[in-house]
């Protein structure tokens, strides 16, 4: 019985403490306006949980900064979008996270909204494989 209790506590600890911010593979839809369709590519981005709290008493002298799982370092990769018209620029550059951390969301480079469009959104409605 003690083994079962230990296993249960270990699983709870693992779920709470170890689901930290880390690199994960995702599929995103990329689109070029000149090409009029989207393609899916695989990339690496940050996902996970960060310790945060929402204070009951909001102290205006001390801002409450919520930490999110975001990139610490990233690189850019470029792909050629196949099937574009010959006169169109068919190169697309996208970010690839190489290191993650829990930090303040930088709205200059990241969608910090509660509900963004999502990585598979395509404004043209047509996905090419």
From Swiss-Prot:
Domain of life: Eukaryota
Protein's name according to its UniProt entry: Follitropin subunit beta
GO MF: follicle-stimulating hormone activity
Listed GO CC annotations: cytoplasm; extracellular space; follicle-stimulating hormone complex
Signal peptide annotation: 1-20
Assembly with partners or alone: Heterodimer. The active follitropin is a heterodimer composed of an alpha chain/CGA shared with other hormones and a unique beta chain/FSHB shown here.
Major subcellular site: secreted
UniProt keyword Metal-binding present: no
Gene name of this polypeptide: FSHB
Alphabetized UniProt keyword annotations: Disulfide bond, Glycoprotein, Hormone, Secreted, Signal
CDD domains the record matches: GHB_like
Disulfide pairings: 21-69, 35-84, 38-122, 46-100, 50-102, 105-112
Glycosylation sites recorded in the entry for this protein: 25, 42
Subcellular localization: Secreted
Similarity comment text for this entry: Belongs to the glycoprotein hormones subunit beta family.
InterPro entries assigned to the protein according to its UniProt record, in alphabetical order: Cystine-knot_cytokine, Glyco_hormone_CN, Gonadotropin_bsu, Gonadotropin_bsu_CS
